């Protein structure tokens, strides 16, 4: 089954059981964690999803993004993995929300797709955490216009050291690798999020790559959150 078929099949399966109103209720005011890679966002995500009244899709949303070919990267030239409002046309928004809804689970592992009415007996807020979210705020804000963003920041020394460690492991094992065989790149693949300007890192050390990812992640988050009302985010 190709990616487009998967997207539409998941949407159809969800809508066979859930109404539009129920889908909107399940995705009401999601909490989206923003951070550089290796900033402790997994720990925060795991803490929040153990609280009553929360839901999640069981992990990071790479599997949802992966089903939408035009959301893999900014453009076909792979200039970055940054997404903006233009990537979120009305049909994409509907299908993306449906695909997220199809994976929703609460703390007791109750599935929204299997029994929407039971799932919605108690209000729940989706907790979403994926490193690439740092580059996708305009897109996410259009898909989830009532979202609340949490900006998690970690000091550069520890954060960059952790990114270097993860890259070392990723190049050896494939873990953390988001763009294997990236055209124009001088290593087996690229790990974590792909910011604009990544080609300038060809031939550079892992320390320089890690520092670049830390800087671009935090800089992009700060710049995009500054365009939103203050009540839309917290640090």
Which ranges hold each PLM region?
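PAPS-dependent sulfotransferase catalytic domain
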Residues: 69-71, 120-235
């Amino acid at each position: 089954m190709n990616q487009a078929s998967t997207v539409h099949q998941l949407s159809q399966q969800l809508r066979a059981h859930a109404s539009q109103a129920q889908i909107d209720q399940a995705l009401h005011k999601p909490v989206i964690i923003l951070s550089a890679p290796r900033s402790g966002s997994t720990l925060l995500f795991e803490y929040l999803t153990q609280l009553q009244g929360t839901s999640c899709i069981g992990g990071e949303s790479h599997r949802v993004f992966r089903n939408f070919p035009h959301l893999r990267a900014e453009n076909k030239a792979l200039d970055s993995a940054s997404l903006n409002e233009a990537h979120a046309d009305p049909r994409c928004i509907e299908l993306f929300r449906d695909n997220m809804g199809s994976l929703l689970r609460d703390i007791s592992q109750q599935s929204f797709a299997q029994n929407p009415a039971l799932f919605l007996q108690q209000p729940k807020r989706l907790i979403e955490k994926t490193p690439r979210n740092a580059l996708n705020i305009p897109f996410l804000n259009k898909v989830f216009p009532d979202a609340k963003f949490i900006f998690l920041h970690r000091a550069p020394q520890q954060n960059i050291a952790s990114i270097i460690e993860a890259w070392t492991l990723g190049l050896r094992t494939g873990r953390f690798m988001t763009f294997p065989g990236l055209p124009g790149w001088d290593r087996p693949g690229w790990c974590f999020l792909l910011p604009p300007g990544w080609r300038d890192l060809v031939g550079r050390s892992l320390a320089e790559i890690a520092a670049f990812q830390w800087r671009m992640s935090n800089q992009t988050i700060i710049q995009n959150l500054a365009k939103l009302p203050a009540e839309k985010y917290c640090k």
